[in-house]
C-alpha cells in the first residue's frame, strides 16, 4: 500500500502500534519536558485554564502546524522511499528550527531515548534488511517517523497521533505546574481536539517554502527557563 495516501485505513496492528508510540507510559522520559510551558507559568503569561487554551492554540497553529507536523510527513515518506539525503535534510532542518538550547536538547534526548527503546524491541533500522541508516544526531520527530513507517501507520494517522501526544504532554505538564485540575485539562482536550484535526489538514497542504515556526514568545520563555531558579521540568 502507499503509506502516504490519506485514504488508507489503518490496520488494527498499526493502530495499536501508534497507540503504544504516543502512550504517556512509553519509557522515553517525555514527562520531564514541558517545551517552554513551565516558563510561561513562571513569567505570568499563563495563569488559568482560558490562558492555557490560548497558549496551546498558538503553539499548535504557529508551531506544530508549520513545523513538526509537515516535516513528520516528509520524514515518513523519506523512510518509505529509502531517501537518506531527505532524512538528513529534514532532520537538520528541524534542529535548525529549535530556537533554544533546551528545545534542541529535548528533541535530541527524546530521539536518543526512543532509539534505545527500539533497539531493545529489535525495531531499529537495519542496513542488512535494506533500511537506510538514521541520520547523525536524529531528533525525536525523525525517529517517530521511522517507527510509524515501520508499523505501517499511514501518514495522516501518524500526524494525528503525534499531535495528540503533544497535547497530552502539555496538559500533563500544566496539571503538575500551573496547577490545572484534571477536569479542566479534559475540557481543554475536548476544545482542542477538533483543532488537532484542522492542524493536520493544513500541515498536509503546506509547501516547503511555507514551513517554519513563528513562536517568538515560546523562544523567549524557553531561553529564560534555562536560568529559572525553581523548576519541575527540563525545558
Curated annotation (Swiss-Prot):
Belongs to the UreF family. GO terms for cellular component: cytoplasm. UreD, UreF and UreG form a complex that acts as a GTP-hydrolysis-dependent molecular chaperone, activating the urease apoprotein by helping to assemble the nickel containing metallocenter of UreC. The UreE protein probably delivers the nickel. The lineage of its organism: Bacteria, Pseudomonadati, Pseudomonadota, Gammaproteobacteria, Moraxellales. Required for maturation of urease via the functional incorporation of the urease nickel metallocenter. One of its GO terms (molecular function) is nickel cation binding. This is Urease accessory protein UreF. It comes from the Bacteria. The gene is ureF. Keywords: Chaperone, Cytoplasm, Nickel insertion. It holds the Pfam family UreF. It is found in: Cytoplasm.
Amino acid at each position: 500500500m502507499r503509506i502516504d495516501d490519506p485514504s488508507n485505513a489503518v490496520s488494527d496492528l498499526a493502530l495499536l502500534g501508534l497507540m503504544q508510540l504516543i502512550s504517556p507510559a512509553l519509557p522515553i522520559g517525555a514527562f520531564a519536558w514541558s517545551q517552554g510551558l513551565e516558563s510561561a507559568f513562571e513569567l505570568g503569561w499563563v495563569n488559568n485554564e482560558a490562558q492555557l487554551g490560548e497558549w496551546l492554540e498558538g503553539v499548535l497553529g504557529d508551531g506544530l502546524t508549520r513545523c513538526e507536523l509537515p516535516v513528520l510527513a516528509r520524514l515518513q515518506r523519506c523512510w518509505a522511499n529509502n531517501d537518506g539525503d531527505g532524512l538528513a535534510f529534514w532532520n537538520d532542518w528541524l534542529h535548525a528550527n529549535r530556537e533554544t538550547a533546551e528545545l534542541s536538547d529535548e528533541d535530541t534526548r527524546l530521539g536518543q531515548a526512543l532509539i534505545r527503546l527500539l533497539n531493545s524491541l529489535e525495531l531499529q533500522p537495519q542496513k542488512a534488511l535494506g533500511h537506510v541508516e538514521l541520520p547523525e544526531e536524529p531528533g525525536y520527530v525523525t525517529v517517530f517517523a521511522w517507527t510509524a513507517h515501520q508499523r505501517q501507520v499511514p501518514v495522516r494517522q501518524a500526524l494525528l497521533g503525534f499531535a495528540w501526544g503533544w497535547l497530552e504532554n502539555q496538559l500533563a505538564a500544566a496539571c503538575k505546574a500551573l496547577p490545572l485540575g484534571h477536569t479542566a485539562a479534559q475540557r481543554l482536550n475536548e476544545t482542542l481536539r477538533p483543532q488537532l484535526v484542522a492542524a493536520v489538514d493544513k500541515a498536509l497542504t503546506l509547501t516547503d517554502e511555507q514551513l517554519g515556526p513563528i513562536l517568538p514568545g515560546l523562544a523567549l520563555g524557553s531561553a529564560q527557563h534555562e536560568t529559572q531558579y525553581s523548576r519541575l521540568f527540563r525545558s
